[in-house]
A protein has these predicted regions:
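Structural core segment of the AMP-binding/adenylate-forming
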Residues: 68, 75-139
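Helix N-cap/beta->alpha junction signal
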Residues: 60-62, 107-108, 142
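A short N-terminal helical cap/helix-turn-helix that marks the beginning
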Residues: 1-21, 144
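Short, Lys/Arg-enriched, disordered terminal segments
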Residues: 1-4, 47, 129-131
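Conserved pre-ATP/AMP-binding loop-to-beta segment of ANL
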Residues: 19-21, 130-148
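Conserved S/T- and glycine-rich ATP-binding loop of Class I adenylate-forming
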Residues: 56, 73, 104, 143, ...
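Conserved AMP-binding/adenylate-forming core of the ANL superfamily
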Residues: 11, 19-50, 55-63, 67-71, ...
Length: 150
């Protein structure tokens, strides 16, 4: 099967490796990963109204929550704006404004007081019903990720 989008690729990998360990420290399997991605996507859609074409930033270190968030954002057809933790606050704010960012999923220690959109703790995800998840219909030409370079 050739995946049409990032979420279908994830779904395929998780279904073929569902009992394999994805994250050793938390003994999390690929099946657990897929469930958490769906839960996070439901939260983004229901609590924040995130939908296809919106931009959601991620400001986090290299953690499982970063990956869960990335896959959740793209599964909704939204664009993930990657914010480099090594850049300064003004640069982050500029990127958020230029991309019409709707939400920032960030580690709480990296929250920005003057952010032009809401900040949400990337590690503080409530349990939502993953059965309410609906994958967005996307095209190969849809943008999944935004990155700024120097």
């Amino acid at each position: 099967m050739i995946a049409k989008n990032i979420y279908e690729m994830l779904q395929d990998v998780c279904s073929r490796n569902k009992d394999s360990i994805f994250f050793v420290r938390q003994n999390e399997t690929y099946a657990d990963l897929l469930k958490k991605v769906k839960q996070r996507a439901v939260l983004l859609a229901q609590r924040f109204g995130i939908k296809k074409g919106d931009t959601v930033a991620i400001l986090s270190g290299n953690t499982p929550d970063f990956l869960r968030s990335y896959f959740a954002i793209t599964s909704l057809g939204a664009r993930a704006l990657m914010l480099d933790t090594g850049l300064n606050t003004n640069e982050h704010i500029n990127m958020m404004k230029r991309t019409d960012c709707k939400l920032v999923m960030a580690q709480q220690s990296l929250f920005i007081d003057d952010a032009p959109c809401p900040m949400f703790d990337i590690e503080n995800i409530d349990d939502t019903d993953e059965n309410e998840f609906t994958m967005a219909q996307t095209e190969r030409s849809d943008i999944a990720q935004l990155s700024f370079t120097s």
